[in-house]
């Protein structure tokens, strides 16, 4: 597994879909995935098609009684992509946590607010 961002699943909607599929049962029904992701039918249809075209998601269509149903599951490639993307996000989180605190205050110096002067300092124009 390589820790690198995956531009295909980086958009939050696709990342949510993949994350829910990775954490869910083998097959997840359309309505359950839509509700868990908090998105509309059309958004799930469009974004799942992108993921399916990339080989990250498998789609199965069928019926329960007379009602048509659609189920999704993450493929092995999709699972690897999610794991790599999450590893990259974890590395990014570690880097941010290890970064020094930014300087605060006014003035025209590094860490100051651009265009703001420190109290008691007159700026000439």
Feature locations, PLM:
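Glycine-centered, phosphate/nucleic-acid-interacting loop/turn motifs that mediate DNA/RNA or nucleotide
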Residues: 55
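Short, hydrophobic-biased segments on the C-terminal half of alpha helices
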Residues: 48-49
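Juxtamembrane helix-loop transition sites at the ends of transmembrane segments
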Residues: 31, 40-43, 74-79, 94-97
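N-terminal helix-turn-helix DNA-binding core of bacterial DNA-binding proteins
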Residues: 2-43, 64, 71
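Short beta-strand "wing" residues that participate in macromolecule-binding interfaces
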Residues: 59
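Amphipathic alpha-helical dimerization/coiled-coil segments
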Residues: 2-3, 19, 80-125
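Basic, amphipathic "hinge/linker" alpha-helix immediately C-terminal to the N-terminal HTH DNA-binding motif
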Residues: 64-86
């Amino acid at each position: 597994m390589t820790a690198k961002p995956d531009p295909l699943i980086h958009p939050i909607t696709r990342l949510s879909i993949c994350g829910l599929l990775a954490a869910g049962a083998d097959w997840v029904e359309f309505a359950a995935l839509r509700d868990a992701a908090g998105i509309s039918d059309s958004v799930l249809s469009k974004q799942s098609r992108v993921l399916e075209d990339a080989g990250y998601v498998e789609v199965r269509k069928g019926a329960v009684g007379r009602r048509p149903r659609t189920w999704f599951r993450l493929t092995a490639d999709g699972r690897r992509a999610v794991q790599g993307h999450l590893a990259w996000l974890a590395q990014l989180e570690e880097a941010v946590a290890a970064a020094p605190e930014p300087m605060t205050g006014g003035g025209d110096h590094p860490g100051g607010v651009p265009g703001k002067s420190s109290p008691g300092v007159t700026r000439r124009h």
